[in-house]
């Protein structure tokens, strides 16, 4: 259902949504959600990245079964996410409150997130005519936009945990694309 909703989040003809699903290693339906020719009957699943989430080192046989399933899917899904490692990385910086949080990740898995949190991601389009100076200016402006965007936390239709987490951390990402 969430993937179907994400299909309609389009601005200027460009999809503006990304999803991640972190499931148990034992969840066989999620393991095979993007196996075979899933795009024929369930094209909306293209909007989500699916990963198995484990909290402790799995048995080698279980891990290899998951790895084999990923290979056989021919879609690069389901990925493997180590929550214990994410918790250690979040703690390592010394800037984040770890107690009481189970960390996950954003759809591309480059940012460690609390449950019910997102990153304010700003994109800079790289053009063939850009110079180092023009790119630095774009990154500066994207940082300002993302910082402002992080203050917009009046989320009327979701739980208050989203507001609390996004205000406490105000995560910001700037990426180059194009």
Label every PLM stretch briefly.
Residues 4-99, 176-178:
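Conserved, charged catalytic cores of large soluble enzymes
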Residues 1, 9-21, 151-166:
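Flexible, glycine/charged-enriched surface loops at secondary-structure junctions
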Residues 72-178:
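Function-dense linear segments that define catalytic or interfacial modules
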């Amino acid at each position: 259902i969430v993937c179907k909703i994400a299909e309609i989040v389009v601005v200027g003809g460009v999809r503006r949504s990304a999803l991640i699903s972190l499931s148990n290693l034992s969840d066989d339906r999620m393991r095979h959600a993007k196996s075979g020719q899933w795009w024929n009957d369930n094209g909306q699943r293209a909007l989500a990245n699916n990963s198995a989430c484990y909290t402790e080192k799995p048995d080698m046989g279980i891990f290899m079964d998951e790895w084999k399933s990923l290979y056989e899917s021919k879609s690069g899904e389901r990925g493997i996410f180590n929550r214990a490692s994410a918790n250690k990385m979040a703690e390592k910086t010394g800037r984040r409150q770890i107690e009481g949080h189970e960390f996950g990740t954003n759809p591309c898995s480059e940012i460690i997130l609390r449950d019910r949190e997102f990153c304010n991601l700003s994109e800079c389009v790289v053009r063939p005519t850009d110079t180092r100076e023009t790119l630095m200016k774009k990154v500066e402006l994207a940082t300002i936009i993302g910082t402002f965007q992080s203050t917009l936390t009046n989320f009327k239709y979701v739980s208050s945990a989203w507001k609390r987490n996004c205000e406490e951390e105000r995560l910001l990402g700037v990426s180059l694309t194009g």
